[in-house]
Amino acid sequence: MRIVAVVAALAIAGCVLPGCAPLITESPGEGLSPVNAISDGPDKHLMLFGHDVVSYFTDHHHQLGSTAIKSVYKGVTFRFATAEHKAMFDAAPEKYIPQFGGFCANGIAYAIPWGGDADTWEIFDGKLYIFGGKGSHDAFMLDVPRNLKLAHHYWDTEVNGSNAFFQRAKRLIFRVPHYKTGKELADEVARAKK
C-alpha cells in the first residue's frame, strides 16, 4: 500500500512540476513581475523571447537580440541587436520596457496576463505595448483610450506584483464585468471594418 502511495505521489509530481516553470520564469521577484519571459540557457527570465525592445523605437520593427549583447534589469534579461541599443537601454531602461510586463495589452484590459507576440505591437504616448496577435490588437484598437484605461487599472490593482499563472486562473473563472468572448470581439472587429 505504501509503495502505491509513493508511486502515485511521484506520478502526480511528474505531471504537475513541469507546469511550474512559468510560475518561476514569469515571476523574477526583483521589481518586474510578472513578465512575459522564458528561460533560455543561462537567461532564466528572458523578456519577449529575446527580442530587442529598443528596436521598436529606433527601427520601428521588432528583431531578435544577440545572446552576446544583453543587460539584466530588475532580474529580467533583455537582449539587444546592437551595442548601441544596449547602451540606450542601460541609460533609460524604463523608457523601453514593454508595458504590462510584455503581456498582451488586450488581455490585461481583462485582468488576464496572456503571453504577448513580439511582432504585434504599438507605441502609444512613447510607451511600448505588446499584443497576443492580430485579433487582440484589432480588438484593442476599437477603443484605445478605454482599453488603455482598463488595462492600466487592472495592471495597477490586480496583476502587477502577482503571479501570472494564478492571476490567469482567477480571471478565467471570475470574469471582469466587461468581459467579451473571443467571438464577440471578432464580431465587433468585423463590424468596425465594414
What are these regions (language model features)?
Residues 20-74, 94-194:
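Intrinsically disordered, low-complexity terminal tails and linkers in eukaryotic proteins, enriched
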